[in-house]
From Swiss-Prot:
Signal peptide: none annotated. This is CinA-like protein. It comes from Flavobacterium johnsoniae (strain ATCC 17061 / DSM 2064 / JCM 8514 / BCRC 14874 / CCUG 350202 / NBRC 14942 / NCIMB 11054 / UW101) (Cytophaga johnsonae). It comes from the Bacteria. InterPro entries: CinA, CinA-like_C, CinA_C, CinA_KH, Competence-induced_CinA, MoaB/Mog-like_dom_sf, MoaB/Mog_dom. It holds the Pfam family CinA_KH. Disulfide bonds: none annotated. SUPFAM superfamilies: CinA-like (SSF142433), Molybdenum cofactor biosynthesis proteins (SSF53218). Gene3D superfamilies: CinA-like, MoaB/Mog-like domain.
Length: 417
């Protein structure tokens, strides 16, 4: 079963708002075995909408449309539905009663004609009652395709998807099973991971597809199995995950879709009952921010010193001015001193330190733009690594932040493994 999601609104096309509706709808459809064939964003233009509907007719099983259901002149979806289905707008008594109660009872103001117009729906549609707002959803079928119209307001759309659309599709359509399994890897790029697992990937059964989802510092491998026998799919996924683990066990750190590196590091620290602190210069507290963003971080994250200026490194962290004069503020030696000193100050098992030149100009540093030194103080000594993350500034900061957590993760995994 295939679906297309259509978002209507000029505000999306000019970048004024971000379309989060399609993301939510696609996830909900995937959960019940409906494949999202495509996502389309179009303008508030009746002819454009009609052309889109005609193109999608019989191409997919379900077209879910969001937006354009408001009471103003630029909201044209209902009238367009009427034209496409050769129908007319009529007042739905239940919707009118709901709108009246909401406006007069809840908001305590007289109902206007624009409010009343929200109760106008195509006479042939199945009304999807919207308890969260005034605009009802609409369900209409033409030949082999169902067209569903939903309000664009996210919380109203979510209510109708969860309480009307999904239950109705489940009841009326037979669908295949879709099973996903996500493998989280850290520390190696997409091409290297692909090279390592090439033979394994080539031997996957036809009903299992593999997708590479790279992010800075990590690659997610998402396996998707589709078929009619759920037990067969689950067994095949599990067997292939086990064989994959035997190949890249050294870089697999989890199996949850949305698990981030800060979450993985947090779990490792908590499991080992270890603590961490940070001393940051070029990353400006971003490493600390990621660590602190995880629920329960207080169990292992003790604090941070953002020593952006040289005087902060000297006066707060206690880094020797002589050391800075000898090696420069952007150096392995200064990074190591920062890590050791914050580890001692906050009495943690591990400490991360960053110092570098993120650009856009060299400033007081002689280091090339993009140069970053990352130090990790451990119970057994200090590890320092030099990187050049290039440009622009934002990229340098983000990559240095992720790399810092990668280094910590690898060091902890040496103990765990």
């Amino acid at each position: 079963m295939k679906a297309t999601i259509v978002t209507i609104g000029d505000e999306i096309l000019i970048g004024q708002i971000v379309d989060t509706n399609s993301n939510f709808i696609a996830k909900e459809l995937d959960r019940i075995g409906v494949e999202t064939y495509e996502m389309i964003s179009i303008s508030d233009d009746k002819q454009h909408i009609l052309n889109t509907f005609a193109q999608l007719q019989n191409k997919v099983d379900v077209v879910i449309v969001t937006g354009g259901l408001g009471p103003t002149k630029d909201d044209v979806t209902k009238k367009t539905f009427c034209e496409y289905f050769d129908d007319e707008l009529v007042v739905n008594p239940e919707v009118l009663a709901h709108v009246t109660e909401l406006i007069e009872g809840f908001y305590k103001r007289p109902i206007s004609q624009l409010n009343k117009d929200q109760a106008l729906v195509p006479s042939k549609c199945t009304v999807l009652h919207n308890k969260m707002g005034t605009a009802p959803g609409m369900w209409m079928k033409k030949e082999n395709t169902v067209f569903v119209s939903l309000p664009g307001v996210p919380y109203e759309m979510k209510y109708l998807v969860e309480n009307e659309i999904i239950p109705k599709i489940v009841k009326e359509y037979k669908r295949p099973y879709i099973i996903h399994k996500t493998i989280l890897t850290y520390g190696q790029g997409e091409s290297l991971v692909a090279e390592r697992i090439e033979n394994w990937e080539n031997n996957l059964p036809e009903f299992i597809k593999l997708a590479y989802l790279p992010n800075p510092g990590r690659v997610r491998l998402r396996m998707t199995a589709r078929g009619t026998d759920k037990e067969v799919l689950e067994k095949a996924i599990e067997e292939n995950v086990q064989s994959l683990d035997a190949i890249i066990h050294d870089i697999i750190v989890g199996y949850e879709e949305n698990e981030t590196i800060e979450t993985v590091v947090g779990k490792l620290l908590a499991k080992q009952n270890k603590t961490v602190s940070t001393a940051e210069s070029c990353t400006g507290g971003k490493v600390a921010s990621l660590l602190a963003s995880v629920q329960g971080a207080s169990a292992y994250f003790k604090g941070s010193v953002v020593s952006y200026a040289t005087e902060a490194k000297v006066n707060v962290l206690g880094v020797s001015q002589d050391l800075i004069d000898q090696f420069s503020v952007v150096s392995a030696e200064v990074a190591a001193a920062m890590a050791l000193n914050v580890k001692n100050i906050l009495k943690t098992d591990y400490a991360i330190a960053t110092t570098g030149n993120a650009g856009p100009s060299k400033g007081d540093s002689e280091a090339e733009i993009g140069t970053v030194f990352i130090a990790l103080a451990t119970p057994n000594g200090v590890i320092t690594e030099e990187f050049n993350f290039g440009q622009p500034r934002e990229k340098v900061i983000d990559r240095a932040t992720i790399k810092s957590l990668e280094i910590l993760q690898k060091e902890i995994l040496k103990i765990v493994q």
